[in-house]
Amino acid sequence: MEKSFVKRVFAFFLILAAFAFLSLPQAFAEPKGTVVMFHAGSLTMPFEAMEKEFEARYPGVDLQREASGSQAAARKVTDLNKPCDIMASADFKVIDKLLIPKHADWNIRFATNELVLCYTDKSKFAKEVNAKNWYNILQRKGVVWGHSDPNLDPCGYRALMVLQLAEKYYKKPGLYEKILANRPVENIRPKSVELVSLLQTGNMDYAWEYRSVAVQHNLKYVSLPDKINLGNYKEDPYYSQAVVKVTGKKPGEYMEMKGASTTYGITLIKNAPNQEAAVAFLEYMLNPKGGLKILKDQGQPPFIPCRVPTQKMKSTLPEKLQKLVEVKD
């Protein structure tokens, strides 16, 4: 009799426990579904590696990525109204200028980079080019060089900034215009990574890229002085002398991009279709043992911890991300 009673009580509590488990909030369930990310082309290889690692941890999530120039990525949201969860930019200012406040609330700065002049063994004067003569070689007849579109890709306007700063640094009046005179319009491509294949096939001699892209694609490159490579935040006052005008939020509008050290930014779009899974990816990506480690391994220095400019912005982040971020302008 007692044993039967104990069994019934045990069964009752077992059923209660089962109901309690089944009624747990959805937050305890693993994220699932599709996460759409628009990102800078220079992040393609590290994000490819992150995608594999993240999806192995969360088999129910399908991370779908679209690479483009950063401004082009932002305009997919602002102009084309394409569904998107996450946008990652090679210049955090693109998010500030084009997405905040209408399409995003915050902007996490997660990595840096620097510009280099890439080439291959097939390039003209490959055995001659160095940090002291590159600007002369780019002016030589028959040398084919290019950069990405400044209106679509930060690497494009940064390439122009490097040339402006080089004119000042080397004290060569008119150098900027002289170098550009040897670059036809057809050598400007929508995003910087498109220039990689032109270099590798020998159809282009030199191209401006981020150092991380050069490392990832095993390209040779000329490293530039900190004063002009846009890679050292301590040189921001010097970099600010360079200014490039690019297309703005609306047709016919323009905005000025002022020289500054290369800083990448990432945000969650306000009407993200799958916010839960998107935040799970961001939590993985911003972790020093997760996505930031992949960035570092692929030649791109991450900020550890990542940063936002104000405490107010930090307070608007999802709780899971706040612990991975510091306040630092």
UniProtKB/Swiss-Prot annotation:
Listed PANTHER family: MOLYBDATE-BINDING PERIPLASMIC PROTEIN, MOLYBDATE_TUNGSTATE-BINDING PROTEIN WTPA
Protein name: Uncharacterized solute-binding protein SYNAS_25580
Lineage, opening ranks: Bacteria, Pseudomonadati, Thermodesulfobacteriota, Syntrophia, Syntrophales
GO molecular function: molybdate ion binding; tungstate binding
Keyword terms of this UniProt record: Signal
Gene source species: Syntrophus aciditrophicus (strain SB)
Coiled-coil intervals, chain numbering: none
Residues of the signal peptide: 1-29
Statement: the UniProt record of this protein carries the keyword Signal: yes
Keyword Signal attached: yes
GO biological process: one example: molybdate ion transport
InterPro entries: ABC_trnspt_W-bd_WtpA, ModA/WtpA
